[in-house]
């Protein structure tokens, strides 16, 4: 799915915030090509977004919210990553997103937290409109506005609205039948530093990235390890330094002899995994006729690198 608009109320420090991720018209003199929905050349959206801001400005929180929204779309369940700011007030999110089957969706969810912090849905609105061959994102957004205002869909549209009462809770039954394809990969900063379990690491990408950060690294050797007799061997990566030192990146993402690395090089392992995931997904999905949209979110892993290196990686 491709996010085109996000509105947040009472989530983390977002009291009433809205983010537009679409273009009203084709942009000129931009470094990226193809910032439009495949098959809909006038439906422009921002393919890559670089979010900047000071400490505690909401960058990590935004990633957690987006991840929580995508999990809700997949499982129809609210997760703890959607944290309320004022616990005694309802929170809500409203997202517009496009999918590869040429539909522009809108989802509105209002929810609350009880004394134990458990989240419960109070109201749900969901609908979609068709994206015609020459439609812009602005045009279909106007269609969504009308659909949600009137609540009466045309034969080519869909609309669902459910609200809880004192007697009845929100069941989400019609919405549970709506299935969304696509996936996501969020690498978010936390209070405890950790690396992600490696599943699609590419040895060549790992070597190119970390040697960019640390010139004392001479190479990377891919090896295998057998965790148990009934499991297939897992990949590990031996990082070799000029002075004969070495570090090992395990299949769980742990790094031995990590003190040998600078903080920037340590984080570069995560960056390599992130880039590997994007390239691997592109290669795997390129052979499909119905290519699903994927979301990738990298949080602060370039904070300890030189600005020139940061630009090269991006």
Residues covered by each model-derived region:
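Switch/communication elements of ASCE P-loop NTPase nucleotide-binding domains
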Residues: 1-75, 247-314
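Phosphate-coordinating catalytic segments in nucleotide- and nucleic-acid-processing enzymes
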Residues: 2-12, 16, 20, 72-282
